[in-house]
Amino acid sequence: MAITDWPEDERPREKLLARGAQALSDAELLAIFLRTGQQGLTAVDLARRQLVSSGGLRAMLDLSPERMAHLPGMGVARRALLLAALELGRRYLAEPLERGLPLDNPDKAGQLLTAQLRGLPFEVFACLFLDNKHRLIAFEKLFQGTIDAAAVYPREVVRRAMEHNAAAVILAHNHPSGVAEPSQSDHAITRRLVEALGLVEVRVLDHLVIGDGGWVSLASRGAV
């Protein structure tokens, strides 16, 4: 049975407009993107297959464009639409914090940094540069690859902080494994940067480790 033959209040698009996006399942939301199904499959059926094939919604949305292309029914046009929507979501999450609002608690910083770093297939070390009222001056991704004490250069972080005339910074990096628990190396990096930035009177407010399910604040654990 085609979706057009379903009761109107069960069709994904009409259901979304009448009851809000929160009322739809993952497959129903994805079906709105797909618009049509395949031979013998409605858009909702096809969406379910894609979700099962990729291991769930989060795993699907974290796929690289190349791997996403192998999902059933995911052609170039659909892939482009989905990737564009994901980027719009990331920018929406980041934009409110780019207007000079104070980043005075881990939740505000965590929202911005999660939007930028979660789900990347490699480690990225980034920094929020703040003014003396803890308002955002700039966000920069400084290093990528295997992030350990040998791969993060305090001199470069200090240089960028001084170029931005920053009074404080919030450090962050992601764990591609999805597990946000800080490692011994994470603690070592934090200590080195606190010491180096302290020499130029730049405060390290926090170091956030970003995972799939959220983030861990080293400051909240007394490590900053």
Curated annotation (Swiss-Prot):
Transmembrane segments: none annotated. It comes from the Bacteria. Zn(2+) binds at H173, H175, D186. One of its GO terms (biological process) is proteolysis. Keywords: Hydrolase, Metal-binding, Metalloprotease, Protease, Zinc. A motif (JAMM motif) lies at residues 173-186. The keyword Protease applies. GO terms for molecular function: metal ion binding; metallopeptidase activity. Residues 102-224 form the MPN domain. The keyword Protease applies. Pfam families: RadC, UPF0758_N. Belongs to the UPF0758 family. This is UPF0758 protein ABO_0214. It comes from Alcanivorax borkumensis (strain ATCC 700651 / DSM 11573 / NCIMB 13689 / SK2). The lineage of its organism: Bacteria, Pseudomonadati, Pseudomonadota, Gammaproteobacteria, Oceanospirillales.
